[in-house]
Amino acid sequence: MDNREKSRLLWKCRRGMLELDLLLQKFIANEIDRLTENQLKAFDNLLTHNDPSLYAWLMGHEEPEKELLEIVSFIRNCD
């Protein structure tokens, strides 16, 4: 992944909720180079959803749509 694409994803991690900002920015900073192409696409897709949905999925309050389940689980389990 080139630097421009990394920067674009980092920018998309900036949300309207501080909790999401912290969680997503930490995840992408630590994991971006280890994600597969499919995981990167899923992560990019995940970031198109609204903040309340993202928060509910990442906190485990709700289950995301099937195509996002793997990346959401991956984010939940990253430290």
From Swiss-Prot:
Family: Belongs to the SdhE FAD assembly factor family.
Compartment(s) of residence: Cytoplasm
Domain of life where this protein originates: Bacteria
Transmembrane residue ranges: none
Name recorded for this polypeptide: FAD assembly factor SdhE
Single GO BP term: succinate metabolic process
Annotated Gene Ontology cellular component terms: cytoplasm
Originating gene: sdhE
Keyword terms, alphabetized: Chaperone, Cytoplasm
InterPro entries: SDH, SDH_sf, SdhE_FAD_assembly_factor
Pfam families assigned to the protein according to its UniProt record, in alphabetical order: Sdh5
Role summary: An FAD assembly protein, which accelerates covalent attachment of the cofactor into other proteins. Plays an essential role in the assembly of succinate dehydrogenase (SDH, respiratory complex II), an enzyme complex that is a component of both the tricarboxylic acid cycle and the electron transport chain, and which couples the oxidation of succinate to fumarate with the reduction of ubiquinone (coenzyme Q) to ubiquinol. Required for flavinylation (covalent attachment of FAD) of the flavoprotein subunit SdhA of SDH and other flavinylated proteins as well.
